[in-house]
Amino acid sequence: VGMIVLNDAYGTGLATNIRSSVESAGGQIIAEEMFNEGDSQFSSQVDAVAATDPDAIVVISFQQATSIVPLLTAKGIDPAQLFFVDGNTSDYSGDLDPGTLEGAQGTIPGPFASDNFKESLLEIDPALKDWSYAGESYDAVTMTALAAEAAGSTEGTAIAAELQGVSADGEKCFDYAGCVTILREGGDID
């Protein structure tokens, strides 16, 4: 596996974890080339990684992917060999030719946003296009509201004191209304 990595805490942190995962699965990182924020030329990194003929290439970047990917494909790298991270899994239809990323894969943090969940969010904000952290944000707001209900207060310290209590060792509930009902009936929720 080859890697082209943004040289900052985000990029190097991901690279360390990817290296660990690849190696623990029996793979090997055969090339790792860094670039700095603000760089606009990536030919040397692409040339160095492509020269090792890796089975896969991980691109740890943000918008720089729009410059890096065409250089990789011009070197004969099949898009199916490309792997992206949350920072560069975006809609590149306005930046790259159709088919440029066909077969490429990427990761996005958090749970998969179901169509029903997306539809619910679009009812609130029809312009929403990015679902990154949507599930976590929804859960955080819901947990905070439930903790406020359990505390009977909107004071930050009171809410904080109840967060663990509304998320462990109680009756399972799966929506806000159901959880609030249990709390208001004197029950304990999880």
Where are these regions (language model features)?
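Extracytosolic ligand-binding ectodomains
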Residues: 1-190
